[in-house]
């Protein structure tokens, strides 16, 4: 036997699991593209001056089992205290049926944002249910399909209030003093770049202030008080002031809807509908507004439309508001939202239904009443008479109370002067309440839960009668049917079957990096050591998190060539925003606050100009040459014209045109020459890792899409993570946090996300990926991603010309197929090809980005040659079908492409088409068939007849 023990131990086994093509397949593809080896191919494609001489030092690979054991040991350093801190975060009970069938199910978590509605009807229905929950609980007319968190939703509400305000000269935004501190933090950060003045005061004093365009109120207040704002809102409305309310979703089950009180905008966190705290996230925010403001709303909105056969179908509505179309004029820079978490909250509401939710809310409130009655009976004073689940208890010996709490492994809110805060939740039991009595009163309190229960059951006055909800909620059948586990399991499976995710087929979306989300990477996110921590718990209780985050940050520093990494941004768009703010504050620190011009190539992703606008910058577009590269002559001219006002350039590398631009270092030098900074968008980092790095290239700051390059799943449209890497001179200007001091960060800047480490509970996914791949595997992943893209490009080039190539006719990790000549010849469009691919069992590539009339394909390293060939064969078969149209065999108005996709019911319907049923639904011998449930959507109908709440069950049948 010639193998050594080290070889038999095979610590790099996961590399072969993650990378799709085996060694033999890789060699076949290398032969097809005319390269001798992966290193030779990389050497041909990547400019010599930016190739790393040595790989980043992130360690050797580990097996799945070794990495899990190592991370488990780290996680065990976290202390699982019972947290009553509140402040927008509570413990939950995630129903096991949802845990197993959604959160742990790749059919849900590996799907992409539903831009292709025909393959997304399941999660679109779940999101429509989420919108219905939002509408019922807020009492408003229009709801979005989730935002990133409550604090960023507050910032979006402020921006929206200004957009819709009739008080055009007013420039002040009022925030009630009992709004959660992290919310105020994020609002202040956003207001600064928009030039708004934020006024913080008692809500009842709002009328003392002038020039207010909008008001933010909290229901329930951060220390627990329920407010009856009916009269105040009425007065504010009479003065044309836009009113936003941050609301507790569980409290809204019992309380009067803010919309009924006159609020214009209502938002909040849906976390306590089944989503673990996870040390701060990810969590979905809900957001609702009056119908008249619908076109000013941020984020995705799911609407009811019709398909080509006239059947009810769902789609993302009014996309013309969004960044990928409106760019710097968009309502928001939001791209990824929190779809997976919104769907968990949605299904939590479906499973419990209105009766179950009321039982949970009433139980929480009853236990709070019992706790309040016992404390008052023993002489303690409550700061607020009206409350739902949170008590603000005045204590003489605060230090003693906190010491007893710590000894009992309990966290109380401790930042209130001369008082402690206690927030109960759905996990709270009568035993927990007895333990709280002991902490606050001593062991010999003599209180009895049943006796107190009898007292408060007949005489509870903690919710004002006027604030009790008097209307029914969740009356739609979907919330009143699936309450047994069997029914719920089948309902969730029926939704899953409607969608196309990575567990069924390759998703070749360009600029999206739909790679493997390995099971070993996903396992740790549901460990209670990670899932149950409150984001504001004492740091000594989160030593495991701190170690894991620090180690991940260190790896990312080495992989990016930067000096520091900030983990706070909880999406790629938030990362862009945070990075641009760092640049802005850096210039201000040098008395160069006038630098506000951001250069952006014409090919840029839509979030770039939208983020620049949010950061208070002016966007100046730089032209691209005929080869799709940044036009250096135009860049120099624009930089010189900007002069002392140049703030930065935002550039993606490899470019969004799918090539490694040879002049990238020269681009950086030109911008630096004029005093600007270089923001290198990390969207295409999957073609850099181990080969080059942004810092080595010459950039100053980048965001990293951990949900692309570093294996966090897309979740059907979120969660994402967008940490930023910065050079040392920008490190003092990354986001900070008003509640938690971030260890190792000297920044004094405001927050961009509610939690200090963003969506911390999904960071273990990226930790596991890097740990299992090691330096060797990470570089190989980038190389195979490049190989796979070039293999597709070379095989499809004759049928679908590749629009842009780099040196030696190569592409980077993705390629753009130019459909425009075919469309001109035949009338068949990129849309027709995209929809026809569904019949072949594939999600479409990215359509018309970054160039209209094209398809951008990114296969990633995780797809095997077998799957690549299946996709290539499908594309070539479609090209043959287009030739049939061109030859007149099939008319342009009636052929398999323009009628695609085809659904099962067509097999048994009358058939009058000039092609067979077999050609329609089993083209080119497709065997493993994915069946879409709707035909092509009517986008125009959907936007002209906007309807964004649940439709009758009969419409789905």
From Swiss-Prot:
Catalysed reaction, written as an equation: N(6)-[(R)-lipoyl]-L-lysyl-[glycine-cleavage complex H protein] + glycine + H(+) = N(6)-[(R)-S(8)-aminomethyldihydrolipoyl]-L-lysyl-[glycine-cleavage complex H protein] + CO2
Keywords: Oxidoreductase, Pyridoxal phosphate
Protein's name according to its UniProt entry: Glycine dehydrogenase (decarboxylating)
Pfam families to which the protein is assigned, alphabetical: GcvP2_C, GDC-P
Lineage: Bacteria, Pseudomonadati, Pseudomonadota, Gammaproteobacteria, Enterobacterales
GO cellular component: a single term: glycine cleavage complex
GO biological process entries: glycine decarboxylation via glycine cleavage system
Modified sites of kind N6-(pyridoxal phosphate)lysine: 708
Function: The glycine cleavage system catalyzes the degradation of glycine. The P protein binds the alpha-amino group of glycine through its pyridoxal phosphate cofactor; CO(2) is released and the remaining methylamine moiety is then transferred to the lipoamide cofactor of the H protein.
GO molecular function, one term: glycine dehydrogenase (decarboxylating) activity
Subunit structure as annotated in this protein's UniProt entry: The glycine cleavage system is composed of four proteins: P, T, L and H.
Family: Belongs to the GcvP family.
InterPro entries associated with the record: GcvP, GDC-P_C, GDC-P_N, GDC_P, PyrdxlP-dep_Trfase, PyrdxlP-dep_Trfase_major, PyrdxlP-dep_Trfase_small
Cofactor(s) the protein needs: pyridoxal 5'-phosphate
Superkingdom of the source species: Bacteria
Naturally occurring in which organism (per UniProt): Escherichia coli O157:H7
Enzyme Commission number(s): 1.4.4.2
